[in-house]
């Protein structure tokens, strides 16, 4: 089985809608540039146009086309959205599901889908669940099956579910549960005209923002579905060298700084396949939280149970990536990373899409973001992180987004009493 970076890691309105959002995109960019880890369009920043935007004249661009083009070029426009539906009071602008008014609003049904997804993606602890991590991974794997050299197919087209062959590939092992759940959602909502490709990418963005501290990425619908399998061998292996991984992503129009941002999705993960004997071990000390601990702990020391991919370590040390890696780990790194990840994921989610200009912005259907978060059981997690013995119940409860306080105290107390285990 060929285990990939994302297989291993993730298997495991108006501004007034967010009054606490103090920094504008321009302010974030200015601070980042001053720190030397900025978004200047140099050789390490993604700025290549994709799909129909690569050939359309500016005079033919729709508002969506203009916005996406600006984001792809790295211009001064935020890849995050603050647009929302008002769902209560006299200002309510969300029509009832199944009504003509909802059918007339392309994004209306997506708000109801988002509500269903959020209930599955958010755990009792407030952290995101394994289904959320898997949804992000599914989005990566569907879109990632594309390269500039593979012809006019592949990419974000829903084929990872619609083409049965793709799920038989080892690189997609572990996605079976989220694929089955996504099929359930699709069967429930296809009567309203949704597409599988859109559902996969919408789910990934809902999952990202449901994870505490995650960005609220501009989200588009209207992709064309395909049942043609994507090309093989276009997903990144966890054992790849820095040169190999950087070239692989550059062939997807994603430059080293973009790759640096995307691998940060490992911050929520608990690996299962790279080392099955350590199944459930996280890649940083705050699993299920969309923070920058992954960058700091990959670069430096980390608790005993934190599992580092060899490929992440070699990338962190590469001269084309190290400065950006350190910037994400440093002061102001969360806002910097969220913006860079959002921009790069928009690019990834549109690979192989040749009707970008005709898409609809449905960002207003996304859940609200969580701007601050303290895990209610972090003290218990810290105890668990300091140990190495595998206790499946603890790892599984974390994967489900549960609060492990009582569980870990009971389990570790029992181990101490029986074996004299110190913790």
Where are these regions (language model features)?
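Catalytic cores of secreted/periplasmic or lumenal enzymes
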Residues: 18-423
């Amino acid at each position: 089985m060929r285990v990939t970076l994302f297989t291993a890691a993730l298997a495991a309105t108006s501004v007034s809608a967010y009054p606490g959002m103090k920094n504008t995109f321009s302010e974030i960019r200015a601070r980042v540039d001053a720190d030397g880890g900025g978004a200047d369009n140099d050789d390490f920043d993604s700025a290549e146009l994709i799909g129909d935007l690569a050939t359309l004249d500016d005079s033919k661009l729709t508002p969506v086309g203009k916005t996406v083009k600006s984001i792809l070029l790295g211009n001064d426009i935020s890849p995050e959205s603050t647009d929302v539906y008002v769902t209560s009071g006299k200002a309510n602008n969300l029509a009832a599901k199944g009504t003509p008014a909802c059918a007339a609003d392309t994004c209306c049904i997506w708000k109801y889908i988002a509500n269903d997804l959020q209930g599955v993606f958010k755990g009792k602890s407030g952290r995101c669940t394994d289904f959320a991590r898997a949804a992000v991974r599914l989005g990566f794997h569907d879109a990632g099956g594309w390269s500039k050299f593979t012809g006019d197919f592949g990419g974000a087209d829903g084929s990872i579910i619609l083409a049965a062959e793709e799920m038989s590939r080892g690189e997609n092992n572990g996605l079976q549960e989220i694929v089955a759940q996504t099929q359930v959602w699709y069967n429930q909502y296809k009567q309203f005209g949704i597409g599988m490709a859109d559902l996969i990418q919408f789910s990934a963005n809902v999952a990202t923002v449901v994870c505490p501290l995650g960005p609220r990425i501009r989200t588009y619908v209207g992709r064309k579905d395909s049942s043609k399998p994507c090309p093989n061998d276009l997903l990144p292996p966890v054992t790849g060298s820095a040169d190999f991984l950087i070239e692989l992503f550059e062939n997807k129009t994603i430059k080293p700084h973009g790759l640096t941002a995307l691998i940060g999705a490992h911050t929520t993960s608990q690996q299962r396949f790279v080392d099955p004997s350590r199944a459930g071990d996280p890649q940083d000390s705050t699993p299920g939280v969309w923070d920058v601990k992954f960058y700091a702990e990959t670069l430096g020391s980390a608790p005993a149970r934190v599992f580092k991919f060899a490929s992440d370590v070699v990338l962190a040390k590469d001269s084309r990536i190290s400065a950006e890696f350190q910037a994400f780990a440093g002061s102001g790194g969360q806002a910097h990373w969220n913006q860079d990840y959002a921009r790069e994921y928009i690019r990834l989610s549109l690979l192989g899409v040749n009707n970008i200009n005709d898409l609809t912005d449905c960002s207003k259907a996304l859940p609200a973001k969580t701007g601050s978060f303290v895990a209610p059981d972090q003290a218990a997690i810290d105890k668990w992180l300091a140990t190495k013995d595998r206790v499946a119940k603890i790892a599984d409860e974390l994967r489900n987004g549960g609060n492990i306080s009582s569980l870990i105290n009971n389990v570790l107390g029992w181990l101490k009493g029986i074996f004299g285990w110190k913790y």
